Amino acid sequence: MIMIREACINDIPQIQRVRNAVKENTLSDPGLVTDMDCEEFITQRGKGWVYEMSGRVVGFSIADLREYNIWALFVLPEFEKKGVGKQLHDVMLDWYFMQTAQTVWLGTAPGTRAEAFYRKAGWEECGTHGKGEIRFEMTIAKWSLVKRR
């Protein structure tokens, strides 16, 4: 059975497994994103979703309403290019813009599949973030146009 559902605290071990399995945008130290960080983002700062196949989390996304950004969107490498990320992305942005009209942003490394994914999804580049990441933004108006495509 396949489903996208709201992430809960019990999903955090599988969320961490997905986060640490990616080939791009890897963490220099897997301990940088703790279970407590995940819990805070899915219970207090925003909301998260998991893409589950037969009880196994193969992707997840988390939106942060406090900083108006996408905190995470990751898919296991063997499930990339199968629509998992797109579905998680769309559910997350639909929810985000139901909560606020504030422009949402994210950062990702240049020259990655993630960069291409966000460009294709309609995100607009608007500078840099952190250590050389590309900063992308999505407005509520742009999202309403992108969704109709």
Regions found by a protein language model. Give the residues of each.
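Conserved GNAT-fold acetyl-CoA-binding loop/helix
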Residues: Q16-T43
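A short beta-loop-alpha structural element at the N-terminal edge
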Residues: I2-R17
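A short helix-loop-beta-strand connector motif used in the catalytic cores of GNAT acetyltransferases and
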Residues: E39-V50, N69
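Conserved beta-strand in the GNAT
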Residues: V50, R56-D64, N69-F74
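Conserved GNAT acetyl-CoA-binding A-motif
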Residues: Y96-A109
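A short, internal acetyl-CoA/4′-phosphopantetheine-binding micro-motif in the GNAT/acyltransferase core
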Residues: L73-K81, T108-A109
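Conserved acetyl-CoA-binding loop-helix of GNAT-fold acetyltransferases
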Residues: K81-D94, K120
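Conserved active-site alpha-helix within GNAT-family acetyltransferase domains
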Residues: K86, P110-G127, G132
